[in-house]
Design a protein with these regions (language model features):
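Conserved core of the PLP fold type I
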Residues: 60-187, 204-205, 209-220, 225-228
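Conserved small/polar residues in nucleotide/adenosyl-binding loops
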Residues: 233-237
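A structural signal for short, well-ordered beta-strand segments and their strand-loop junctions
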Residues: 33, 115-116, 197
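Residue-level marker for buried hydrophobic side chains located in beta-strands
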Residues: 168, 196-197
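N-terminal small-domain helix-loop-helix segment of the aminotransferase-like
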Residues: 2-95, 102
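A secondary-structure boundary/capping signal
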Residues: 35-37, 117, 231
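Walker B catalytic acidic pair
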Residues: 200
Length: 237
């Protein structure tokens, strides 16, 4: 279908969080709101039509998720990442932040330590804190024009951690992890019995000839160690 990417839509005053919450969050409207994953393109017409068709049914009760729902995700993964995840192991949630929150609360206890890599998306700090967990930050280091893992520090902190929240690809650094980096982080976590939760929400926004790798597909160890969290609408908004 044809799409007009040149159409400019003024979203100010439409209860759009991206624009209408600038004063509350930042104290000024004189800024470009890059803080939220919300594009300014109009939703594609087939999606609008599908929403209208559903709304015309007039009843908005509890909706089941048919097998085709999970099969669509499986087909997406096959096509883009050469991965065929078992639909029986898939779980639906409202979003990645909600998934991370549920996983932290389910697989750790009060005062347990959660490993993250800074600088990173602010929710990685907030989710453990709000759940009464403690954050361990493995600071990424800039070396040879690229951000890299300080593996000595990573392993020391992994010895204390219950869960490692991996940002893959990394937000905000735009870092696409190499296979060897993912393997090493997962091996260290497996060695120290640390659950790896891989936030892969930006996996479909890869540039410069890079290839995104699902952390769970890296090795047999990864299958035992990694929970993958992904979301289609952030990259296709």
């Amino acid at each position: 279908m044809q799409y007009n990417f040149d159409e400019v839509i003024d979203r100010k005053g439409t209860r759009c969080a991206k624009y209408d919450e600038r004063i509350k969050k930042f104290g000024t409207e004189d800024l470009i709101p890059l803080w939220i994953a919300d594009m300014d393109f109009k939703t594609a017409q087939p999606i609008i039509d599908a929403c209208k068709k559903r709304a015309e049914e007039g009843i908005f009760g509890y909706t089941s998720r048919p097998d085709s729902y999970f099969e669509a995700v499986q087909n997406w993964e096959k096509e883009r990442y050469d991965w065929c995840p078992d639909t029986a192991l898939m779980s639906w949630s409202l979003g990645v932040v909600q998934s991370l929150t549920a996983i932290v609360r389910t697989f750790s206890h009060m005062d347990d330590k959660i490993l993250i890599q800074s600088p990173v998306y602010t929710e990685f700090w907030d989710i453990p804190d709000m759940a009464g967990r403690k954050v361990l930050a493995n600071a990424l280091v800039e070396k040879e024009d690229r951000w890299q893992v300080d593996f000595a520090d990573f392993e020391e902190k992994a010895k204390e951690a219950k869960i490692f929240i991996l940002c893959n690809p990394h937000n905000p650094l735009g870092l696409v992890w190499e296979k060897e980096e993912l393997q090493k982080m997962i091996e260290i976590c497996h060695k120290h019995h640390v659950l790896v939760v891989s936030d892969e929400i930006h996996s479909d926004l890869i540039f410069h000839g890079k290839k995104h790798l699902r952390a769970a597909t890296i090795s047999p160890l990864a299958k035992e160690t990694v929970i993958t969290c992904c979301l289609l609408y952030t990259s296709d908004a």
